[in-house]
Amino acid sequence: MGNEVRVRYAPSPTGHLHIGNARTALFNYLFARNQGGKFIIRVEDTDKKRNIEGGEQSQLNYLKWLGIDWDESVDVGGEYGPYRQSERNDIYKVYYEELLEKGLAYKCYCTEEELEKEREEQIARGEMPRYSGKHRDLTQEEQEKFIAEGRKPSIRFRVPEGKVIAFNDIVKGEISFESDGIGDFVIVKKDGTPTYNFAVAIDDYLMKMTHVLRGEDHISNTPKQIMIYQAFGWDIPQFGHMTLIVNESRKKLSKRDESIIQFIEQYKELGYLPEALFNFIGLLGWSPVGEEELFTKEQFIEIFDVNRLSKSPALFDMHKLKWVNNQYVKKLDLDQVVELTLPHLQKAGKVGTELSAEEQEWVRKLISLYHEQLSYGAEIVELTDLFFTDEIEYNQEAKAVLEEEQVPEVLSTFAAKLEELEEFTPDNIKASIKAVQKETGHKGKKLFMPIRVAVTGQTHGPELPQSIELIGKETAIQRLKNI
C-alpha cells in the first residue's frame, strides 16, 4: 500500500442524498484533502431491485451542490475503474474462482426453506442464528445430485475456525470478533451477483484504499471483509466507524422520522445555503480545537483531524442548523437575499412572477426588513404573512397588550396622525409616533407595543416605521380602527 491517502464514498443509487450519507462523503473528502490524498466515489449498484432511475446522478449533483469534489468516479474516470460495481462482475469472478480453487470458498446448494428452518431451530435453542456449514464438504456425487434437482448454488466463504479477527478502529479503538460466531457467509448469490461484503473488499483492495471511513452500522461487516483480505494475503486498510446521528430524543435518525428534514435536496428546496450545510454537517460527530463553530471549506480542510471524530453519537439539532444558516444569510448582500427568498414568495402566491418596478422596490424593502433574522429562504413566507393578509390574528400575548387602558387613546391618536400624512415614509411615520407620545403622554412600551400589535399582530418584529410603510397607509389605519 502506498503512502498516499486514498478514501472513498460508496453510495447506492437507491434514493436521494441523505444527511448521514452526506456526512460520510464530507468526512472522507475532508480527510483526503487535508492529507493531500485522493477522494473517490464508487457507485455500489448491485442491488438492482432497490436502484431508482436517476438515483446515481442525483447523489452526484447534490454532493457537488454542497461543495464536494472528487478525483475519480463514474463521471471523471480514473485508472482504477470501472467505478460502478455492476460493471465489475468479470473482475469479481476472477477472485471468487481463486477462492474456490484454493478451498477457501465452496458452493452451497441449500434452499431458502432449508436455511429458514435452520435459523428457526437455532433461535428456538437460544443460539445466535448462523449458517451451520452443512454443505462445507460436499462430495462430487452430492453436488451432482443437487444440480440434477435443478438447484443453483450460492458461493460461501469458508470462515476459519477458532480465530480472533481484531482491528484498531480510528474512532472506536480496539475491536475484535470471534470467527466461530460468524458462520460461513455468502460471497456470490445464486444469480451470480457478488454480495456487498465480497465486492467491497475486492474493490477497496484493487482501488488501493488506505482508509475506510464509514458509519458504525458497518462494524459487523468489517470482520468478513478482513477475512477476505487475509484469504488473498492482502494488506488491510485502516477502518474508522463514525457514530450514529441521533435526534433530540437521542434515537437513531430514521428516514421514517418526519420531524427532521433528512435529505439534502429538501434543504436546497427550502432555501438553505450549501456553505452553511457543509459547515453544519462538518460538525456532526467531529469537533475542532477551540470554541469556533463557523468555518469555510478551506478552513475545514486545513484543520480536519480524523483523530477528532467523536466517540459518542452526533446530535442533529435543527435549531443549531437554522442558527448556522442564519449566520451565512447575514453575510449575503440584499440582491443575494432577494434571489434566495423571492421564488418562495412567488411559489406561495404572495407576489406575482412578473413585477413592476414599483412592486420590485416594495419586495426588496420587505425582504430587507427580515434579512438579519432570516434562517432559510422559505421562512420569508411565514415571516411576512402579516403583509399579505386582510385579517390578522392576535395570540394571547398580543390580546393582553391590547387590553391595557391607554390603548384606545394611543391607537385613535396614531390613526388620526397617519391620515394627515401626505408622504407615507418611515421618517414621517416615526414623527407621527413621536407626536402621539407628545399628545398623550404615553411613551416606551406603553406607546410602541399597542401600535405594533394593532398593525402587525405581533409583539416582536423588525423596525416599526418601515413595517408600517410596507403594510400601507390604508391597511394600517384600518387595523388601528378595528381594535
Swiss-Prot record:
Zn(2+) binds at residues 108, 110, 135, 137. Its cofactor is Zn(2+). GO terms for cellular component: cytosol. Keywords: Aminoacyl-tRNA synthetase, ATP-binding, Cytoplasm, Ligase, Metal-binding, Nucleotide-binding, Protein biosynthesis, Zinc. The keyword Protein biosynthesis applies. A motif ('HIGH' region) lies at residues 11-21. A motif ('KMSKS' region) lies at residues 252-256. PROSITE patterns: AA_TRNA_LIGASE_I. ATP binds at residue 255. It catalyses: tRNA(Glu) + L-glutamate + ATP = L-glutamyl-tRNA(Glu) + AMP + diphosphate. The keyword Aminoacyl-tRNA synthetase applies. Its main location: cytoplasm. Binds 1 zinc ion per subunit. Its EC number is 6.1.1.17. It is an enzyme of class 6 (ligase). GO terms for biological process: glutamyl-tRNA aminoacylation. InterPro entries: aa-tRNA-synth_I_cd-bd (IPR045462), aa-tRNA-synth_I_codon-bd_sub2 (IPR020751), aa-tRNA-synth_I_CS (IPR001412), aa_tRNA-synth_I_cd-bd_sf (IPR008925), Glu-tRNA-ligase_bac/mito (IPR004527), Glu/Gln-tRNA-synth (IPR000924), Glu/Gln-tRNA-synth_Ib_cat-dom (IPR020058), GluQ/Sye (IPR049940). GO terms for molecular function: ATP binding; glutamate-tRNA ligase activity; tRNA binding; zinc ion binding. Disulfide bonds: none annotated. Catalyzes the attachment of glutamate to tRNA(Glu) in a two-step reaction: glutamate is first activated by ATP to form Glu-AMP and then transferred to the acceptor end of tRNA(Glu). Belongs to the class-I aminoacyl-tRNA synthetase family. Glutamate--tRNA ligase type 1 subfamily. Monomer. This is Glutamate--tRNA ligase.
